[in-house]
C-alpha cells in the first residue's frame, strides 16, 4: 500500500488532464481544474471510494468556501489517515490557498494510493454517498448542469459557411455579379479568422496552467533559500559570535544592496586577518623558545658563580639526604 511515495516516484509525473479525468469518472463530477478540489471534500470522498464506510460523509462539506470550513474537511481526512495508519503529511495551509502545484502534487499522491488499494477498478456509487454530505446534492446538480450545458453548446453550434458552390448558385439572381461575388467572398474570408481565433483558447488555458505551476515551483524554491539565509542571519546575531570579523563580513554580504559586489572585497579584508593571526602564533612560539633559552643560561651562570665552599655544602647536603635518618651531618 503506497503510503510513503518519494518525490521522484512515477506518481508525481501524472499529468493534470489524467488526474481530472480520474476524479470526474470516479466521483461523477465535472471539475475543470485540480485546484477546484482544494476544499478537501473531494479527497474525503476519494478515500471513501477505496475504504467504504471509513469516512463519515455526513461531516464532509462540499459547499466549503472559507478556510475554516475547508480545514474542517481536512480534519476529517486526517482522522481517516490516522484510522488507516497512513503517515502521509497533509499540508493544509498550502492546499486551502488553492495553489495549483500543491494541489496537483497531493492529488497525484491520492491517485497513487487509491490505485494501489483497488487496482484502478471503480465500483462506487458516488452520487448516493455524496447525498449524505453538506452541499453534496448541490455539487451533483452543478456537475450535471455543466455537463448538460457542454452538450447543448456542442449540439447548437452553427453550421459552417457554405462552399463556393453555394456562391455560384446565387450568381444568376444578381444583376451586378461582380459586386455580389466580392461581397460574398469578403464575408467568407472574414469568417475564417474568427473561427481560427476561437480554436486556440484551450491551448492558451493549458499554457496558463503550466506557467502557474512553474511560478509555484519558483516560489517554493525562493522560500527554501530564504529560510536558509534567515538561519544564517540568526546565527550571525548570536552575541557570542557577532563580534567576530568573519561574522561581520557575512552580515555585510547579506545586507548589501542590489548590484553591490562585496564578496571579493570581504575576501581581501579577511585575508590580512588570517595572515596576522598566523604571525601572532609564530611570534608567541618564538618568544616562548627565547624565554626557555634565557632561563637555561641563567641557571648555568648561577652554577658557575658558586664558591667552592657552597659547592661542598651542596654536595654534603646531597650525601646527608641520601644517608640513614639516624645519621647527622
UniProtKB/Swiss-Prot annotation:
Positions of disulphide bridges: none
Bias kind Low complexity: ranges: 174-185
EB1 C-terminal domain span: 193-263
Basic and acidic residues biased stretches: 130-141
GO molecular function, one term: microtubule binding
Tissue: Highly expressed in the root and shoot meristems, in guard cells of leaf stomata, pollen grains and pollen tubes.
Primary subcellular site in the record, as a coarse category: nucleus
Domain Calponin-homology (CH): 13-115
Segments of this protein annotated with the region Required for nuclear localization: 289-311
Pfam family, one: EB1
Chain spans, region Disordered: 130-203
Record keyword Cytoplasm present: yes
Annotated knockout phenotype: No visible phenotype under normal growth conditions, but seedlings show increased sensitivity to oryzalin, a microtubule-destabilizing agent. conditions.
Compartment(s) where it occurs, according to its Swiss-Prot or TrEMBL record: Nucleus; Cytoplasm, Cytoskeleton, Spindle; Cytoplasm, Cytoskeleton, Phragmoplast
Gene Ontology process terms (BP): cell division; cortical cytoskeleton organization; thigmotropism
GO cellular component, one term: nucleolus
Alphabetically ordered keywords of this record: Cell cycle, Cell division, Cytoplasm, Cytoskeleton, Microtubule, Mitosis, Nucleus
Family matches, as PANTHER family: MICROTUBULE-ASSOCIATED PROTEIN RP/EB FAMILY MEMBER (PTHR10623)
General function of this protein: Plant-specific EB1 subtype that functions preferentially at early stages of plant mitosis by regulating spindle positioning and chromosome segregation. Accumulates in the prophase nucleus and is required to maintain spindle bipolarity during premetaphase and/or metaphase and for efficient segregation of chromosomes at anaphase. May play a role in the dynamics of microtubule network in elongating pollen tubes.
The family this protein is said to belong to: Belongs to the MAPRE family.
Subunit record text: Homodimer.
Entry text on domains: Composed of two functionally independent domains. The N-terminal domain forms a hydrophobic cleft involved in microtubule binding and the C-terminal is involved in protein binding. In Arabidopsis thaliana, EB1A and EB1B possess an acidic C-terminal tail that has autoinhibitory function, but EB1C has a tail region with patches of basic amino acid residues required for nuclear targeting.
Other notes: Plant microtubules behave differently from those of other eukaryotes in mitosis: they lack centrosomes and spindles are barrel-shaped with unfocused poles and no astral microtubules.
Protein name: Microtubule-associated protein RP/EB family member 1C
Native source species: Arabidopsis thaliana
Gene that this sequence comes from: EB1C
